[in-house]
Amino acid sequence: CRTTDTRYNVVRMGDAMAEVFGQAGISVLHDRTLYDYPEYAGSYDRSLAAIDRYLKEYPSIRFVLDVHRDAIETADGGQVKVVSEIEGQGIAAQLSLVVGSDGGGLSHPNWMENLRLAVAIQEQALTDYPTLMRPLLLRNSRYNQHATHGSLLLEVGTAGNAPEEAELSA
């Protein structure tokens, strides 16, 4: 369910991921802005402006991860949740990497670098957690991934997953 309450939305997933990356010694700049509020229209333009601003302010940024929760509905409008049992930890929301390309006609000359990164992440994740990842998706849209190298979209479960399931995926 879509909400602006950061205890239940994608910002919480970003908080959890930032904590895990930080514990691994990886510096994180976590933008907690809801770019799709109050409406979806223009959300990618708004987030692209922020990405450009951050890249100028912090030129050492090596990766941009756009975190989403997928929306999968049943024929009657119910929410589908995607799960993976993580041994000894519980039920986690499955993850899906989405890679944009220039297939829609917009310039994205380095999309294959992002695809290689996604494949490497997918392979490692499947080695460590065999059921955690859904199939990698290659799309014709850019999803602002043209702004920099090392840019991916990550779907953390779906709107049907409990926040705790999505948080465990971090």
How would you describe each model-predicted region?
Residues I51-D102:
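Active-site microenvironments of hydrolase-like enzyme catalytic domains
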Residues N110-L137:
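Active-site-adjacent substrate-binding region
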Residues R134-A170:
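Active-site-adjacent mobile loop/cap segments within catalytic or ligand-binding domains
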Residues T4-R12, A41-D45, H108-R116, G160-L168:
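Soluble non-cytosolic domains of exported or imported proteins
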Residues A24-S27, P59-F63, A93-Q94, P130-L132, ...:
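Loop/turn elements at helix/coil->beta-strand transitions in domains of secreted/extracellular proteins
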Residues G14-A18, D45-D52, L115-Q122, S151, ...:
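Extracytoplasmic/secreted envelope proteins and their assembly/folding machinery
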Residues C1-R62, A71-I72, D76:
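N-terminal catalytic or cofactor-binding beta/alpha core of small enzyme domains
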Residues L34-P38, R69-T74, D102-G105, S141-N144, ...:
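Solvent-exposed loop/turn segments at secondary-structure junctions
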